[in-house]
């Protein structure tokens, strides 16, 4: 029997008309391949981008690549027990982490699970790790100070509540030290703190937790730790989990501070995941969306207005603004701030604190380069006292740097230049500060006033810090009322100035330093 072409065509058409195979849409699939923490799954056509999928009772993954025939899933945890052919189920949920005051004083992993051996956390609220940042209308300008207790930062590079201030520098320049001091400085202010450690050694994170406990700051702090030994997925997600914990306070009219230590390692973890998912690499092998990786994270740090808080809390909290202040940390290679990730984060943030290896080696710690560091919005948030006194300090340091370079080639200098150089040496010495010893507003104001008014000019450079320590002790013991007055409002009026002047004159007359 022979069929001609038209009969074959009619047969095919009849078959097509009678076909009743509805396309299967499944919420259950099969593992096609598993390697390096990335599972390729077939059959889960219903899955959303970023959805949690379940391998077994204890193992979850996150869908990051949605392709025509398969889904690329990053496994959140150990993956050695997963094998080809295993069943995978969609959960229909986006990744959420526990948030709220129950986490204070605890160390958790990148998914909010406790890792400090202090038992489970019974958080009443969970929050998705990815949220859209508040819009322009919902924000309020930054006009309240976030005091770090570090003279060089609060006087020259001030940080406000709701600001994003980058801490950038080479390894071993004191970046984490500044962040930890900022947390310690908040212990009596009611500001809640979140310290996110990504790609750090477990011993380093343990040391941070110990220091915060020692200085009484752990009670209002939660540490989110995705250590170097943890999967890249947890190192990538930890920052978003920490941000969700901070947003809990921001949206309820409270103030929170979050430290990302550090975003360089987070970007490297994301690069690793992207390359394993076979996404096309770009500059320095980073994927094309690495800018968005950090911008969507840092834009969530903001000061929100009272209307936003009232709407979010359904009218429970009225007339209060909330803020989330971010201090992201970036590690540079040999001082190269023009690399891909540093330039991205510099452009996203509201200023940067630039730390220099050279200054650190000279013993100037914190090693802040006042010339390259800037705060774009913090000036309007400074306390009155520090704002009035800080300008003179910055000017003295700038003139000192200029003259010091010139003085290397000049044989004899006029008296005015010599006096400026001597003043600059003492101000540089005064800007040094020991770790774990943040200052109060009053202590800082008195130190800056002493420098501006020339009280340090007859003090030997080596004794400047001894002079300052003795002056603070004298202020807190003999003039506690004056210190309390300055700390309460941060005012700097004629009455306070005359009291401070009389106090320093009396102190210098004693000469006990």
UniProtKB/Swiss-Prot annotation:
Binding site for ATP: 169-176
GO function terms (MF aspect): ADP binding; ATP binding; proton-transporting ATP synthase activity, rotational mechanism
Enzymatic reactions: ATP + H2O + 4 H(+)(in) = ADP + phosphate + 5 H(+)(out)
Domain of life of the organism encoding this protein: Bacteria
Site description Required for activity, residues in chain: 373
This protein's GO CC annotations: plasma membrane; proton-transporting ATP synthase complex
Pfam families attached to this UniProt entry: ATP-synt_ab, ATP-synt_ab_C, ATP-synt_ab_N
Known EC number: 7.1.2.2
Record's bilayer topology term: Peripheral membrane protein
Sequence similarity: Belongs to the ATPase alpha/beta chains family.
Record's subunit section: F-type ATPases have 2 components, CF(1) - the catalytic core - and CF(0) - the membrane proton channel. CF(1) has five subunits: alpha(3), beta(3), gamma(1), delta(1), epsilon(1). CF(0) has three main subunits: a(1), b(2) and c(9-12). The alpha and beta chains form an alternating ring which encloses part of the gamma chain. CF(1) is attached to CF(0) by a central stalk formed by the gamma and epsilon chains, while a peripheral stalk is formed by the delta and b chains.
Role noted for this protein: Produces ATP from ADP in the presence of a proton gradient across the membrane. The alpha chain is a regulatory subunit.
NCBIfam families on file: atpA, PRK13343.1
Name assigned to this protein: ATP synthase subunit alpha
Species of origin: Hydrogenovibrio crunogenus (strain DSM 25203 / XCL-2) (Thiomicrospira crunogena)
Taxonomic path: Bacteria, Pseudomonadati, Pseudomonadota, Gammaproteobacteria, Thiotrichales
Gene name for this UniProt entry: atpA
């Amino acid at each position: 029997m022979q069929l001609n072409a038209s009969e074959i065509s009619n047969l095919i058409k009849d078959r097509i008309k009678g076909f009743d195979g509805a396309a299967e849409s499944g919420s259950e699939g099969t593992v096609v391949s598993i390697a390096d923490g990335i599972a390729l799954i077939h059959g889960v056509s219903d899955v959303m981008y970023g959805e949690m999928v379940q391998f077994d009772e204890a193992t979850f993954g996150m869908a990051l690549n949605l392709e025509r025939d398969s889904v690329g899933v990053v496994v959140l945890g150990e993956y050695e027990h997963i094998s080809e052919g295993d069943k995978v189920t969609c959960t229909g949920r986006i990744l959420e982490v526990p948030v709220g005051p129950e986490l204070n004083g605890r160390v958790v992993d990148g998914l909010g699970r406790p890792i400090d051996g202090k038992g489970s956390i019974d958080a009443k609220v969970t929050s998705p790790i990815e949220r859209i940042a508040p819009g322009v209308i919902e924000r309020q300008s930054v006009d309240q100070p976030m005091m770090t207790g570090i003279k060089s930062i609060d006087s020259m590079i001030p940080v406000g509540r709701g600001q994003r201030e980058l801490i950038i520098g080479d390894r071993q320049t004191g970046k984490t030290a500044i962040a930890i001091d900022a947390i310690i400085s908040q212990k009596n202010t009611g500001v809640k703190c979140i310290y996110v450690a990504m790609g750090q050694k477990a011993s380093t994170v343990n040391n941070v937790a110990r220091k915060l406990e020692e200085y009484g700051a752990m009670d209002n702090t939660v540490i989110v730790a995705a250590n170097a030994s943890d999967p890249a997925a947890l190192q990538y997600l930890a920052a978003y989990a920490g941000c969700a914990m901070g947003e809990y306070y921001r949206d309820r009219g409270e103030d929170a501070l979050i430290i990302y230590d550090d975003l360089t390692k987070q970007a490297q973890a994301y690069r690793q995941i992207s390359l394993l998912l076979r996404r096309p690499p770009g500059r320095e092998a980073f994927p094309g969306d690495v800018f968005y990786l950090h911008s969507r994270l840092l834009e969530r740090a903001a000061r929100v207005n009272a209307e936003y808080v009232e709407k979010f809390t359904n009218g429970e909290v009225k007339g209060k603004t909330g803020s989330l202040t971010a201090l992201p940390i970036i590690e540079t290679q040999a001082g190269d701030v023009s690399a891909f990730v540093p330039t991205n984060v510099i452009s996203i943030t509201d200023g940067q604190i630039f730390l220099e290896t050279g200054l650190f080696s000279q013993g100037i710690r914190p090693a802040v380069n006042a010339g390259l560091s800037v705060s774009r919005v913090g000036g309007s948030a400074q306390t009155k006292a520090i704002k009035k006194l800080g300008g003179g300090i910055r000017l003295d340091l700038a003139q000192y740097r200029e003259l010091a370079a010139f003085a290397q080639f000049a044989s004899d200098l006029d008296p005015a230049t010599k006096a400026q150089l001597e003043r600059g040496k003492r101000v540089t010495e005064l800007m040094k500060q020991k770790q774990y010893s943040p200052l109060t507003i009053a202590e800082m104001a008195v130190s800056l006033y002493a420098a501006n008014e020339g009280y340090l000019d007859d003090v030997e450079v080596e004794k400047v810090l001894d002079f300052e320590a003795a002056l603070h002790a004298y202020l807190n013991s003999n003039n506690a009322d004056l210190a309390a007055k300055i700390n309460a409002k941060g005012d700097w009026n004629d009455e306070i100035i005359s009291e401070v002047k009389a106090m320093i004159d009396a102190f210098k007359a004693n000469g006990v330093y």
